[in-house]
Each structure stands twice: as structure tokens, then as C-alpha cells.
Amino acid sequence: MAKRGKKYLKALELVDKDKLYSIEEAVETLKKMEEVLQRKFDETVELIFRLGVDPKYADQMVRGSVVLPHGLGKELKVLVITQGEKVKEAEEAGADYVGGEDMINKILNENWLDFDVVIATPDMMPKVAKLGRVLGPRGLMPNPKVGTVTQDVKKAVTEAKKGRVEFKVDKTGNLHVPIGKISFDNNKLVENALEVIETVQKLRPSGLKGQYIKNMVMKTTMSPSVKLDVLSILRSLEAKAA
């Protein structure tokens, strides 16, 4: 294990390893740790889920997207690959780049990747498939499951600009989802976190037996993790939905 610095170890002292934290307490603890760590950049706060699924089975693959109420704290560049009347719809919705085969060729021939989200209409997907090797490893390949292959271009662009986050469980059953920057107000981080947890909970595979969300932690890019009280958080979400 890599040797931890003095600031990290001091931040670690702020976490009670035997305690399960509420979301509000976790955010507050991360803020206190940030004062100790004194990083020179605005760290991303993320939720990490340990799910009781085996992703090698297709029916246990957890994948989706969520529109964070308060975004991610950065302006995303959106590329729409489409044709015909949908070009104007994409431009009016605020897409940064819009095109068809010209955009596909630009990516293939110039290794152009100056965008954060790629949206495509279904009619373009046979041609977009050529980009799989380039976009796939970067998590940028359009996919109907997360709303980036769609006829409703306006909605997709609007959601991407607002801060729609895509997520996918990894092969070990872990799921990482960013919820904002440490500079965000506490309430904004809490509300973003609740939206993510509620969305992930709704994606529980129908045939899954046993516990779905085994544990959750919250951390910043380089901070220690804070364990969350999964049962209490899920109960409060159920009560709110009732």
C-alpha cells in the first residue's frame, strides 16, 4: 500500500470508522477533511456503491443515467450526430456540435474528441457503430439505455447540459457516480446524492435475490471514504415516495 501523507492521515482522523453516516453528516465530514487536505483544485465528490449483483449475467447489469438537480459544476460539450430536420432541433437545444457523417469522419480521421457527451438519432447508429473502438473505452458511445440514442434530441441535449450523468456497474460489482464539486453548498450535494441513490435503487434487477445495495461510501477525488447508513437512507426514500 502506498504511504499516506500527513494531511491525509490527519483527515482520516475526522472519520469514525465504526460509524454509518447520514448523507448530511458525510458531506459535512468531507468539507472538514477538505480544510485539512487543502487541495489546489476543486475536487469531485462521488458516491461509490457496492452492489450485490454479478455483472457477467446480462440480467444483473446495472446501467443508467440521472439528471442531477444541481449539475456537476462544469459546462459539458455536447455532440449530436444526426441528419435532416433533427439538425436544427439539436442546434436550437444548445448542442455544441451537430453533424452527420462529417462528424464521424472527423473523429476517425483527426482523432477529434473535444466533447463530453455524444447523442445520436437511431437512423445514424449503423454509421456511428464505426466509432465503437474510439468512443467505447471512453464511455462516450451513444446508448439507448442511458438516453443518448433517441429521436427526442431536444430532451437529450437539455438533460446533458443540465448535468445528466451516465453510470455502469463495473465487473466487480462497484458503481461510481460523481455528484458535484466539494465547493458546492452542502444542500446541493445532499440533493444530488439523494437523486443518484433513488435512481440506482429503482434499477434493481427484477430477479435479484438478497441485498441489492450492500454498502455505500462518499468521498472526494483524493480523500478518505465515509461510510453511509444504507438502510436508514433507503427507508427515508421509501417514506418520501409513499
UniProtKB/Swiss-Prot annotation:
The alphabetized UniProt keywords are: Repressor, Ribonucleoprotein, Ribosomal protein, RNA-binding, rRNA-binding, Translation regulation, tRNA-binding
Q: Does the keyword Ribosomal protein apply?
A: yes
What are this entry's molecular-function GO terms?
A: rRNA binding; structural constituent of ribosome; tRNA binding
Query: What domain of life does the UniProt record list for this protein's source?
Result: Bacteria
* UniProt record, GO biological process: regulation of translation; translation
Which InterPro entries does its entry note? Ribosom_uL1_bac-type, Ribosomal_uL1, Ribosomal_uL1-like, Ribosomal_uL1/biogenesis, Ribosomal_uL1_3-a/b-sand, Ribosomal_uL1_CS
What SUPFAM superfamilies is this protein classified in? Ribosomal protein L1
Q: Name one GO cellular component term.
A: large ribosomal subunit
Keyword tRNA-binding in the entry? The reply is: yes
Enumerate the PROSITE patterns for this protein: RIBOSOMAL_L1
Its job: Binds directly to 23S rRNA. The L1 stalk is quite mobile in the ribosome, and is involved in E site tRNA release.
As for family, the record states: Belongs to the universal ribosomal protein uL1 family.
Identify the HAMAP family for this entry. Ribosomal_uL1_B
According to the record's subunit comment, the protein's assembly and interactions are: Part of the 50S ribosomal subunit.
Q: What is this protein called?
A: Large ribosomal subunit protein uL1
